[in-house]
Each structure stands twice: as C-alpha cells, then as structure tokens.
Amino acid sequence: MRRLLLSLATALLASLAASAGAAACYADYKAKQDNPLRLHYGVAEVRGDCTRAAARDDLARRLAAQGWTLLNVVSVFDETGLEKRKDSAGPNFLRF
C-alpha cells in the first residue's frame, strides 16, 4: 500500500511539472521586407522552448514563408505580457 501511494505521488508530481513546463510562450520581434522597404513589430506565439534562441529559429522560418526577414527577437514572455504589447503590435499581434 505504501509503495502504491508513493508511486501515485510521484506520478502526480511528474504530471504537474510537465503541465507547468507547457505554459504558453510568446515573443515580440522586429521584421522587414525589401523592395519597397517595410518594417513591422509583432507578437507571436513561440513553438518549442521558451528562449530567445528558439523564438528566433521558429519565427525566422515562419516569417520567411510570408516574405519577411526577422531582424531580432526583442523578448520572450508568458501570457501576462500579451495585453501591454497588443496595441503596439497592431495587425501583427499573433499574426505569425
């Protein structure tokens, strides 16, 4: 019985840790298009690890598919940072 309770407790802790690690991740970034030069600031959900390097790789690929070049990732953040960036991102808020 004790072994069963210990196994259940371990499984519960592992599932809690996994769900905490699966929290949404977002990045704000700057991108450009050439001919004519167009610049934009945007906010996008990041797939994968919540790091600037992972965001850079993910966003560069997604933006390039639409003819944009990623200039830089400004920051990565969780959902608590979305609202304060929404107006600045305008039509590029969660577009890519």
Regions found by a protein language model. Name each.
Residues 2-96:
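Terminus-proximal functional modules
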